Amino acid sequence: MTVNDAINLLSRNFSIDEAFLKAFIEVETGGQGFDPLTGKIIIQFEPAWFRKKEPYAPSGKWSLNGVERQKAEWEAFNDACKINEASAMESTSIGLGQVMGYHYKRLGYKDVYGMWYEAENDIYHQVLQLCQFLTTDLELMQAIARKDWHTIASIYNGKGYKELAEKLGREPYDISLKKAYEKHSN
């Protein structure tokens, strides 16, 4: 199943605007659920989340990770896995929608391993997890319906998303999302 096939099917099943899903996935991962070079799932390891889960963990590659290329993300993730695999998985956003692993219960999984297993298997499950995440947050769904890009960005990426974008020299998330939505809705 292609990304577009999964989006088309699941946007209808979950009553989510198809153009919004396409825009969201484009902004999050450029439409890539798997690294074309390695075939591994796209990840973003979050050291701050791992530190919350493992406050006494010794520093290492995991603690130095920023927003990096996939090779560096996987090195940091694998380093954290040596300390606590489940905590590392919960501290990492995965797949097309970059849903954080710690949301596994919210998505209906018994543990984080089940969430990762399905996301690593195929694109369909990555889009499914994103749809499950979106539809289990009423405030987020209301913001999507209103096309309230600032609120969507604040809920999904945190209230400091604009400051982070400025620090990284990137376009703010709300602006990127709005532009991508306009592109996909025409």
Give short role names for the model-derived ranges:
Residues M1-C81:
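Export/targeting segments at the very N-terminus of extracytoplasmic proteins
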Residues T2-A6, R12, S59-N186:
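Non-catalytic cell-wall polysaccharide-engagement segments
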